[in-house]
Amino acid sequence: MAASAEGCIFCKIVRREAPASFVREDAFTLAFMDIQPMNTGHVLVIPKAHAEYVEDLPAGSAGPILEAAKEVSRALRASGIRCEAVSLYLANGKEAGQEVFHTHMHVIPRWRGDGLGLRVRADRGRVADRKDLDNLAAKIRAAMGRSRK
């Protein structure tokens, strides 16, 4: 693991050893305002237990993260904060954009023209070959259950 629970800023927030502006909390998750928001109202939802990557989460603990994000999303829309839509984003690894190595889901208020977006490759519009898709699906199925380590 790149960051131990001891040195992890999100774990420090869970233990109330670092400041945060809390939005919601339950037995498994904690939601708080992102200190470097992409848009006003940007919230992070984390599991209270340290897990660097989503695949490190114990069985059954990913669901509460999405449930918390769903509740935050609903509240953002009703809050009066500018929010025409909501992006849910989870970066899983450095190359995916993960900066804090404690699994977390971004709940980001969105509106037309906010300047945020997912950049896609120029060839994104092509339709993939079914045989290639079937081969990729088979590789992923074969890897199910194997550890990341």
Language-model segments: what does each one mean?
Residues 1-149:
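HIT superfamily nucleotide-processing domains
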